[in-house]
C-alpha cells in the first residue's frame, strides 16, 4: 500500500488524506518535517539522499526529512523517521515551520508545510542505506562555504530552511 500524506491548509489544519505520489504529481500542500541534528562540537549531521529516491537523489540535505502518517502525532513521526533513516534517537524540539513549493525535473512537485526540529547527538550513526547514500558531520562555516560554491549539490528545501532560519539559529536551539 502506498504511503499516505496529511493534506493541510496554509495554517497547517488537516483537510484530507492523499496518496504520496498523487500529492507530488498535483502539488498538493501536505504536512512534513525536517530534522537538524548537531553534535556537541557544533557540527551538523548531513545526509546525501540515496540515488534512487523519487526526486533529489544524490543531493545533500539536512539530517532527516519525512511525513507524519495519518493519525500519527508529529513528535512520534519525527522520532520514528530519525530512527528508521539514520539509526539513532535523540531529544528533538520544534523550532520553526515554513511552507515551500518546488517543481523538479521529473515534473513532481513538493508543496509542504514543514515543521523544523533540532536535536543534539554524539553517538553512533547507523543509516538505512536504502534511504541514505552517505552522511557526514560538518561545521557550519564549512557548510555555508560549500553551499555557496556548489548550490546545486543541495536539496531545494535545505536551501529554503537555511534562508529562513539560518544555521547559527538552528545550532543555538540545538544547544539550549
Curated annotation (Swiss-Prot):
The active site is at 65, 112. Mn(2+) binds at residues 24, 30, 67, 110, 112. Mg(2+) binds at residue 85. It comes from the Bacteria. Its EC number is 5.3.3.2. GO terms for molecular function: isopentenyl-diphosphate delta-isomerase activity; metal ion binding. Residues 28-160 form the Nudix hydrolase domain. It is an enzyme of class 5 (isomerase). Pathway: Isoprenoid biosynthesis; dimethylallyl diphosphate biosynthesis; dimethylallyl diphosphate from isopentenyl diphosphate: step 1/1. It is found in: Cytoplasm. Its main location: cytoplasm. It holds the Pfam family NUDIX. The keyword Cell division does not apply. Keywords: Cytoplasm, Isomerase, Isoprene biosynthesis, Magnesium, Manganese, Metal-binding. GO terms for biological process: dimethylallyl diphosphate biosynthetic process; isopentenyl diphosphate biosynthetic process. Catalyzes the 1,3-allylic rearrangement of the homoallylic substrate isopentenyl (IPP) to its highly electrophilic allylic isomer, dimethylallyl diphosphate (DMAPP). Belongs to the IPP isomerase type 1 family. This is Isopentenyl-diphosphate Delta-isomerase. It comes from Burkholderia multivorans (strain ATCC 17616 / 249). The gene is idi.
Amino acid at each position: 500500500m502506498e504511503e499516505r500524506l496529511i493534506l493541510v491548509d496554509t495554517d497547517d489544519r488537516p483537510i484530507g488524506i492523499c496518496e504520496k505520489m498523487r500529492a507530488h504529481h498535483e502539488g498538493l500542500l501536505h504536512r512534513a518535517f525536517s530534522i537538524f541534528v548537531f553534535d556537541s562540537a557544533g557540527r551538523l549531521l548531513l545526509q546525501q539522499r540515496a540515488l534512487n529516491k523519487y526526486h533529489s537523489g544524490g543531493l545533500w540535505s539536512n539530517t532527516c526529512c519525512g511525513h507524519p502518517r495519518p493519525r500519527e502525532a508529529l513528535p512520534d513521526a519525527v522520532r520514528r523517521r530519525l530512527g528508521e533513516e539514520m539509526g539513532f534517537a535523540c531529544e528533538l524540539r520544534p523550532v520553526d515551520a515554513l511552507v515551500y513549493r518546488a517543481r523538479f525535473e521529473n515534473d513532481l512537485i513538493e508543496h509542504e508545510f514543514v515543521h523544523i526540529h533540532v536535536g543534539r547527538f554524539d553517538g553512533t550513526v547507523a543509516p538505512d542505506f536504502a534511504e541514505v547514500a552517505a552522511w557526514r558531520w560538518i561545521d557550519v562555516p564549512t557548510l555555508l562555504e560549500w553551499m555557496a560554491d556548489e548550490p546545486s549539490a543541495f536539496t531545494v528545501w535545505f536551501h529554503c530552511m537555511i534562508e529562513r532560519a539560518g544555521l547559527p539559529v538552528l545550532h543555538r536551539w540545538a544547544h539550549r
